[in-house]
Curated annotation (Swiss-Prot):
Biased composition (Low complexity): 155-169
Similarity section: Belongs to the CCDC85 family.
Protein keywords: Cell junction, Coiled coil, Developmental protein, Tight junction
Keyword set includes Coiled coil: yes
Residue stretches in coiled coil: 52-84, 113-144
Entry GO terms, CC: adherens junction; apical junction complex; bicellular tight junction
Record protein name field: Coiled-coil domain-containing protein 85C-B
Region of interest (Disordered), ranges: 151-199
Gene field: ccdc85cb
Subcellular location: Cell junction, Tight junction; Cell junction, Adherens junction
Keyword Nucleotide-binding among UniProt keywords: no
Function of the molecule: May play a role in cell-cell adhesion and epithelium development through its interaction with proteins of the beta-catenin family. May play an important role in cortical development, especially in the maintenance of radial glia.
Amino acid sequence: MAKHCPNDDLSKIPDEELVRWSKEDLIRRLRRVDGEKMSLMLEHSNMMKDVNRSLQVHLHEIRNLKEINQKLQDDNQELRELCCFLDDDRQKGKKLSREWQRFGKFTASSVWKEVSTYQQKLKELEINQENVLRENAELKDIILMLDEDRNGAGSRSSIDSQSSLSNLNGGSGTVRDVGDGSSTSSGGSAGSPDHHHNHIHKTVEAKIGTVRRSMDDLSAPHHHRSIPAGLNDASSNYIRQLETKVRILEDNNNKLLSQPCSRYSLSKLSMKYNPGDLRALRKGMTLYHSESQLSSLPQRQEALLNGTGRLQTSESSPSTGFISSAQKPEAVVHAMKVLEVHDNLEKQLPEESEEDLSEKEKAIVREMCNVVWRKLGDATGTKPSLRQQLSGNQFKAPL
């Protein structure tokens, strides 16, 4: 019966049945069960060894993973710190870039403003340069005109003195009427200085007209004169100096003319001075008297021309319309009248061509002019002479 029972199901066999078995069956069955148990224990031990081995492997792997994880965590921390550092640098760079951008915008705007300012200044400087060049050209023209006027005035003085030389050589003591039909030369020769004066009279009159206009402009009031805008300091100072000198000379002349003087009459002047000397005086006096001051002279000239055709030796009456003797010396008044009459008489002379004066004749004419100036200086007494007044450096050019 025991043989028929399964080996692995002994626990299910009841005890009564086991009692019925024989000893041999029981021993055999026990040994078999012990063998099975031993095999099971061996298998279990092997399995435990395998499990332990696998556990050891897993533990080792876990340790390695832990180490790797720790390393990765360390690397991650370093990377995190590096990222924070880089982020700080990025923020700083961004802030710095914004500051540089603002600085660049501000610098660009400032540079553009400065460039526009410098361009405006450059344009102004170009305009000022053009104005200075134009004013320099105008000043050159003025200087050339003043030089020409001064040279023309000197030639007028030399030419007008030739008639005095001819009158002295001819022994004429009085002023001769050039419109009475007689010869215009004392010797009747075509090469005399008086004849030469008739030839160049119109040219000299044109130059003297320019001198009169220039000096009338200089002697005009300050608000009537126009100084070009933008003149440099040297030119404006020079013009102001000229105006100051002209005003000073006008004041001195007015003071001189306000004191009456009756030393010389019209007859003495006409006997003492020949036409060349009186024309030289007229040339000097026109530097300080405008044409409006001589507006009453044509009445006197017309009366003189219609009366006798020659200059009379009588005194001039105060009812002639000219400035009274209480305002000007009689010598200057009579000299101006004689000069105006002679200028009107000389306009009737015919034009003739003659050669220029020789050097000897020019020297004689200059000496006669010096004599006339000395006479005019003696006529004013202790007062400043006309020559000192008229040679007041009013024609000096700016340095």
